[in-house]
């Protein structure tokens, strides 16, 4: 069963959008780790997580996901540093400055997304489960690879279903 937020996100994906899955590449992991370190150098008390397929060392969309965790009421305290490091936030929608602020940029062929966000508990749990269970991690990578060149909406839906299944187990 998909959540309301998952269904909402899926409804916004164009029908003709395709997904491209690439093999894991150590360079992406190094880029992610360097961005995390850069944030920690400026904000040593902020919890920063590197999650997603690159952090898990599996095939993925060649994107890097970094999460800096903070209470939304403290976002203004951190915003000047993040803008200094990453420029103007990319996400200017209804969520900005409420539950997350997002920066997007490219680095050495990787799409990088940096979030100043309240802790995404479900996402963190899924990441920790996959990191600690090699069998599930392999199933997840196989799922991702099976969607290469196919519908992004179907891919995202399958990932959500996979997440919900492992969270319910």
Model features per residue range: what roles?
Residues 1-49, 160-163:
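Helical scaffold of the NTase/Pol beta-like nucleotidyltransferase catalytic core
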Residues 4, 117-169:
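Catalytic cores of NTP-dependent nucleotidyl/adenyl transfer enzymes across multiple folds
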Residues 77-86:
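Short amphipathic alpha-helices in soluble, non-transmembrane regions
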């Amino acid at each position: 069963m998909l959540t309301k937020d998952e269904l909402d996100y899926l409804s916004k994906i164009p029908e003709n959008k395709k997904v491209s899955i690439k093999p894991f590449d150590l360079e992406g992991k190094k880029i992610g780790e360097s961005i995390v370190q850069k944030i920690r150098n400026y904000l040593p008390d902020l919890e920063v997580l590197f999650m997603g397929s690159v952090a898990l060392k599996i095939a993925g969309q060649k994107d890097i996901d970094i999460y800096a965790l903070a209470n939304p009421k403290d976002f203004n305290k951190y915003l000047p540093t993040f803008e200094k490091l990453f420029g103007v936030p990319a996400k200017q929608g209804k969520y900005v400055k409420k539950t997350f602020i997002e920066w997007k940029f490219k680095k050495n062929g990787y799409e990088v997304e940096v979030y100043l966000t309240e802790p995404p508990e479900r996402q963190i749990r899924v990441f920790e489960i996959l990191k600690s269970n090699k069998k599930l991690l392999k199933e997840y990578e196989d799922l991702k690879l099976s969607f290469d060149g196919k519908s992004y909406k179907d891919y995202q839906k399958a990932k959500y279903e996979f997440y919900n299944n492992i969270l319910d187990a």
